A protein has these predicted regions:
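N-terminal secretory/targeting leader peptides
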Residues: 1-202
């Protein structure tokens, strides 16, 4: 449909919220004013009483420093730590509960079809290695960040299973809306729900 071929994908790992106030459970995000990406996530948090504000990455540091926002959905714990976001904001969610983004590499199909078999094989092998490397690297960096942040006095909130289920159930409403956007979206969401139910996390 779009003339693109998927080469491969990888999961960078769970993201962690940055916060200037305690967020130990789902009830605590009521009126939580934070930076959020547009779309589905903003819908879910709004349904739970939070006040997501859509803003660019570049605006987040100043917004946090000036108190314009209470917190931010920015990136992984390690990336947030490396950016210095916990020097002033002493609370975070970890392990994350709300987002596990997936990145991918796609190629123009016409260009892909012109490649020789060994060239395609090399790219497919490289992207698989890249994916495994990124995932393990993020896990290691997050573990290092946990130690450093704990030493800094940052509180890491690990939501209970009950609170995680409350959040996921709230997400179902947004998912139903997004299913209407396209047959592909509906199929993807149903696959996701089936996986979560099979693994006892929904």
């Amino acid at each position: 449909k779009y003339g693109m071929t998927l080469i491969g994908w990888w999961i960078p790992g769970h993201e962690s919220l940055i916060s200037s106030k305690p967020i130990p459970d789902v009830a605590s995000i009521k009126d939580f004013k934070f930076r959020s990406p547009p779309g589905m996530e903003s819908m879910i948090f709004t349904a739970l009483g939070a006040k997501p504000i859509v803003m660019d990455f570049g605006e987040v540091p100043t917004a946090l420093q000036t108190g314009l926002i209470d917190g931010a959905d920015y990136s992984s714990l390690a990336t947030n730590y490396a950016g210095g976001h916990y020097e002033q904001n002493k609370y975070a969610t970890y392990p994350g509960f709300h987002s596990m983004p997936a990145d991918h590499l796609a190629c123009n199909t016409k260009v892909w079809n012109k490649l020789k078999p060994h060239e395609k094989g090399a790219m497919l092998a490289a992207i698989e290695i890249c994916g495994r490397t990124i995932t393990s690297l993020v896990e290691r960096k997050n573990a290092e960040a946990v130690k450093a942040l704990t030493a800094m006095g940052v509180t890491l909130h690990d939501w209970s299973r009950e609170d995680r289920l409350k959040f996921r159930n709230a997400a179902l409403g947004a998912w139903e809306e997004w299913k209407k956007k396209s047959p592909e979206a509906a199929a993807l969401i149903e696959i996701h729900k089936a996986y979560m139910k099979a693994n006892g996390i929904l």
